[in-house]
Amino acid sequence: MDRRIFGLENEYGVTCVFRGQRRLSPDEVARYLFRRVVSWGRSSNVFLKNGARLYLDVGSHPEYATPECDSVPDLVTHDKAGERILEGLLVEAERRLREEGIAGDIHLFKNNTDSAGNSYGCHENYLVGRHGEFSKLADVLVPFLVSRQILCGAGKVLQTPRGAVYCISQRAEHIWESVSSATTRSRPIINTRDEPHADAERFRRLHVIVGDSNMSETTMLLKLGATDLVLRMIEAGVMLRDMTLENPIRAIREVSHDMTCQRRIKLANGREVSALDIQWEYHSKAVEFVERRGGDGDEVAKRVLDLWGRTLLAIETDDLELVAREIDWVTKYVLIERFRHKHGLSLASPRVAELDLKYHDIHRDRGLYYRMERAGLVERVTRDLDVFEAKSRPPQTTRARLRGEFIKRAQEKRRDFTVDWVHLKLNDQAQRTVLCKDPFRSVDDRVDKLIASM
C-alpha cells in the first residue's frame, strides 16, 4: 500500500499540585479540564472541527486521537496540534481554579506510566488491506516491534529492588501478550480487535499498542515511518528473515533494560541475536526496498532510513551523542546524566525522578522538552504555523476533511449533530445520515449536499 491512512491516539497523565503536594484528584482535574468541552459538546467525548476525537478515557486520562492522515509528517503535525489543544484546556482550567480560590498548577504529561505503576498508552493505527492472513502480518511485525524500542523508546528511570536503572522503554514493563483483542487487561503488542473504521471488505486497521508516547518529533517520524516501510515490504512480498522470538514478552523487557542493545535474545529457531541485529536486518532490507522501487523522490522514506541507520550506528559505537537531538530516550538520558553529574546525584534521587517527569510536561513554559526545543537543542519535523493551523483545520486529502467541514458548518449554524469515524448525522426530523466508508476520500457530493442543507 503506497498510500496509507495513519492515526495516533495518545493518553495523557494528569495531576494538580500546590507546593509539591497533590491538590486535586485526577477525576476532579479532569472535570476542570473538560468543563469547556462539555459546555459546547454536551459530552466529554467529542469530535473536533479538525477531524480529531478528544475524550476522557478510563482512569480520567484525557485522550486525543488524531484525524486520519495519509503522510507521516502530517500525522506528526496533527499529534502536536493535539498537545496544543490540551495545553489550551489546561490554561483555561487553571484560570477557573484561580477564580474559585483553589491554588495549584495542573500538569499534563505525555508519558506512559505514573508513580503508582499504572500505565496508559500511545496507540498507532495503520490501514492495511483485508486480503492476506493477518496472523502472518503479526508474526513478522512482533520481532520488529519488540526491538523497535531502541529507535523510539521514551526512556524512564525505573526503581527496582536492586536500585534505580535507566530503561529504554516506558511501556515494555506493562506488555503481557504478543497478539490479543484486549487493550487494557492483557496489554498486547498488537491488538487484533477488528474495527477497521472503514469498508470492512477492503480494509483492516492494524492497531499497535506497544509503543511509547513521544515528545520528539523526529523520534515520532522514525517510529511511524520505519513501521510503514516494514508494512510496505510485507505487502510487496519481500522475503524477510525469520526473526520469530522464543519469548517476546521476556525479550521486550530484556531489550528495555539493556542500553547497549547487545544482549542476546533467543529466537524460536534456537539462534541468539541482539535487538541491534534485528533492527539492522530490517533496516538493510528497507534500504534495498526503497532503492529498488526508485525511491529518490520519497523524501520521507530517505529521512527515515537515514535516522534509522544513524541511531543504530550511535548505539553500536556507544556514541549516543550522535542522535541526542533526535531520539527521545537518548535526549532524556543525556539530560539526566548531565544533571546528575552537575549536582552529584544518584539515579535514585527524587530530583532525577522529577526531571524525568518534567521532560514530558506539555506546557511549553514548564516542560523540559519544550525548553530544549526553544533553545534549539532538538530537531523538528513540524513548523509552529502548521501545528497552529492543524488545531482547527483537518487534513485536506482524507475523510477527515469531510468530517471537519461538516462539524464546522453544523456548529456555525447551531445545528444538532452526531458524528463518529464513519457517520455524519444531522439530528433533525429527517435524521439524515451519510456513511463515509472510504478513509481516502476527501470529496463527497452526499456530504456537500448535507452541509448545504443546513
Swiss-Prot record:
UniProt keyword list: ATP-binding, Ligase, Magnesium, Metal-binding, Nucleotide-binding, Ubl conjugation pathway
Positions bound to ATP: R53, T66, W421
Residues bound to Mg(2+): E9, Y55, E63
Entry keyword annotation includes Magnesium: yes
EC number of this enzyme: 6.3.1.19
One GO BP: protein pupylation
Coiled-coil region: none
Cleavable signal peptide: none
Active-site residues from the entry: D57 (proton acceptor)
Pathway membership: Protein degradation; proteasomal Pup-dependent pathway; Protein modification; protein pupylation
Gene Ontology MF term list: ATP binding; ligase activity, forming carbon-nitrogen bonds; magnesium ion binding; ubiquitin-like protein transferase activity
Database matches in InterPro entries: Pup_ligase, Pup_ligase/deamidase
Note: The reaction mechanism probably proceeds via the activation of Pup by phosphorylation of its C-terminal glutamate, which is then subject to nucleophilic attack by the substrate lysine, resulting in an isopeptide bond and the release of phosphate as a good leaving group.
Purpose: Catalyzes the covalent attachment of the prokaryotic ubiquitin-like protein modifier Pup to the proteasomal substrate proteins, thereby targeting them for proteasomal degradation. This tagging system is termed pupylation. The ligation reaction involves the side-chain carboxylate of the C-terminal glutamate of Pup and the side-chain amino group of a substrate lysine.
PANTHER family according to UniProt: PUP DEAMIDASE/DEPUPYLASE (PTHR42307), PUP--PROTEIN LIGASE (PTHR42307:SF3)
Protein name as it appears in the record: Pup--protein ligase
Recorded name of the encoding gene: pafA
